Amino acid sequence: MNPEDADRILAAQAASGNQRAFGQLVARHGVALAQAARSFGIPETDVDDVVQDTFVAAWHALDDFDPDRPFRAWLFRIGLNKMRDLYRFRRVRQFLFGAENLGDLELAGGVANDEPGPEQQVAARLELARVASTLGKLDTGSREVIVLTAIVGMSQPEAAAVLGLSVKAVEGRIGRARAKLSALLDADSEK
């Protein structure tokens, strides 16, 4: 039996609630999924989480799996989406909290634990609320480029295609939007 057929059988068994069959799918594809995550640049500290999130999502979506298509491709599509989610989350944190690189976010608190303390969580929520309300004060064009690139995670060419602009126009709007946002946030801080 070829691997694709074995995957189809295991997926069908798992979809009917057979956890052992799903465990075999995890064993068959977990290492390759982790290697893919590393190749996409996912930090080692997040690889296991991405793999676990992928398999949890796959377990919940087994009824949607089309047995006429390869299970591995379906699973890796879910994994790729989880990796993109992680990048989006980190990009938003980086943009909103101004870390020079994503590693600075974990080191900024000066503690070994990655989990922020209660004071840091409250401060982060307050800062996020402040930035979100300030985004609403930007003109539509500025808000669109910031949301598409910094929050949704689109590249400048993707944002340009969505907005019907040239890449240079998007670059210019991003620069102006960041300057406006920074000025609004500074003015808000002085109040």
UniProtKB/Swiss-Prot annotation:
Keywords: Cobalt, DNA-binding, Nickel, Plasmid, Sigma factor, Transcription, Transcription regulation. CDD domains: Sigma70_r4. Coiled coil: none annotated. Residues 156-175 bind DNA. SUPFAM superfamilies: Sigma2 domain of RNA polymerase sigma factors (SSF88946), Sigma3 and sigma4 domains of RNA polymerase sigma factors (SSF88659). GO terms for biological process: DNA-templated transcription initiation. A motif (Polymerase core binding) lies at residues 49-62. Signal peptide: none annotated. GO terms for molecular function: DNA binding; sigma factor activity. Pfam families: Sigma70_r2, Sigma70_r4_2. Induction: By nickel and cobalt. Sigma factors are initiation factors that promote the attachment of RNA polymerase to specific initiation sites and are then released. This sigma factor regulates the genes for a membrane-located efflux system that confers resistance to nickel and cobalt. CnrH alone is able to activate CNR expression, while both CnrY and CrnX are needed for nickel induction of cnrH. Binds DNA in an RNA polymerase-dependent fashion. CnrH may be controlled by a CnrYX transmembrane anti-sigma factor complex which binds CnrH in the absence of Ni(2+). If Ni(2+) appears in the periplasm, it may be bound by CnrR (CnrX); the signal then would be transmitted by CnrY into the cytoplasm and CnrH would be released. Belongs to the sigma-70 factor family. ECF subfamily. This is RNA polymerase sigma factor CnrH. It comes from Cupriavidus metallidurans (strain ATCC 43123 / DSM 2839 / NBRC 102507 / CH34).
